[in-house]
A protein has these predicted regions:
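A basic, amphipathic helix-loop patch mediating RNA/tRNA/ribosome contacts
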Residues: 1-49, 83-84
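Short beta-strand element of Class I
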Residues: 31, 104-107
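Conserved class I S-adenosyl-L-methionine
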Residues: 80-90
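Conserved S-adenosyl-L-methionine
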Residues: 97-105
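S-adenosyl-L-methionine
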Residues: 107-160
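A short glycine-rich, Lys/Arg-flanked "PGG" loop and its adjoining helix->strand segment in the class I
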Residues: 159-176
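Short, glycine-/aromatic-enriched active-site segment of Class I SAM-dependent methyltransferases
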Residues: 181-198
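Flexible, glycine-/basic-rich loop-and-beta segments that form/coincide
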Residues: 235-268
């Protein structure tokens, strides 16, 4: 049986108006192939596969924007008139959300290539820094020090990224970091298919990230959970940090309460 790229087939079947839109739907996890979710736009599938688009149309180029949107709402973050950095930009869901919330410039930084959505690539407010490892970025590479940075990275611990981010931010800078237990816990604590389900491991991971952040001089300002799971089904958490002022600690009891609510909400 002949195979086609999923984004092409979705467009040919009239389920998306363009390949760019098809890619966004696929990467948002909204496309089922023979009732199985596929989230890789370049995946090849049988030409006679039954495709179905599910869920509501996203307000951002990817569902990553929903994560940042929750952080903005939960913590009252204001991005109007600010310069921001989207670290681990990928398709640009966070970047899109930043722009829609008034950011005047966004540095979209990602080690990958060709992932950033076309509408963001062509937006004059976006500086596309693809093929760029955040650990190699220095302040002189940015025209303006970001006032805000989001961090959504994979296969690396936040304790390797936060030190670099601190050197890039303005003195009043803020950070919203996505804590992913599967990349923070040791391999022996990661379960089948790369999923960490144990709430105790989640609590420990969050506590250790907090210690690392505070050791760098960041001030914890808030903690909540992501409204959507990661691609493999991992629950993720949003940690809000400042460079000065604000709160001084997030107690173990608060961490436990956030983890419990996350599991109750997302795992039912």
């Amino acid at each position: 049986m002949k195979k086609e790229r999923l984004d092409v087939l979705l467009t040919v079947q009239g389920l998306a108006p363009s390949r760019e839109r098809a890619k966004r739907l696929i990467m948002a996890g909204q496309v089922l192939v023979n009732e199985q979710r596929v989230d890789k736009a370049g995946a090849t599938v049988p030409a006679d596969a039954v495709l179905r688009v599910v869920g509501e149309d996203l307000p951002y180029v990817s569902r990553g924007g929903l994560k940042l949107a929750k952080g903005i709402a939960a913590f009252g973050i204001c991005l109007a008139g600010r310069t921001a950095a989207d670290i681990g930009a990928s398709t640009g869901g966070f970047t899109d959300c930043m722009l829609q919330n008034g950011a005047v410039k966004v540095y979209a930084i990602d080690v990958g290539y060709g992932q950033l959505d076309w509408k963001l690539r062509t937006d004059a407010r976006v500086v596309n820094m693809e093929r760029t490892n955040i650990r190699k970025v220095t302040p002189d590479m940015l025209d303006h020090a970001p006032d805000f940075a989001s961090i959504d990275v994979a296969f690396i611990s936040l304790d390797k990224v936060l030190p670099v981010v601190r050197t890039l931010l303005s003195p009043e800078g803020e950070v919203l970091a996505l804590i992913k237990p599967q990349f923070e816990a040791g391999k022996d604590r990661v379960g089948k298919n790369g999923v960490v389900r144990d709430p105790a491991v989640h609590e420990d991971v969050i506590a250790r990230v907090l210690v690392a952040a505070e050791g760098l001089g960041f001030v914890p300002r808030g903690l909540t959970f992501s409204p959507v799971k990661g691609p493999k089904g991992n629950i993720e958490y949003l940690l809000y940090l400042g460079m000065q002022g604000g709160r001084t600690a997030i107690a173990d009891e608060e961490i436990a309460a956030v983890v419990e609510e996350a599991h109750r909400t997302l795992d039912g």
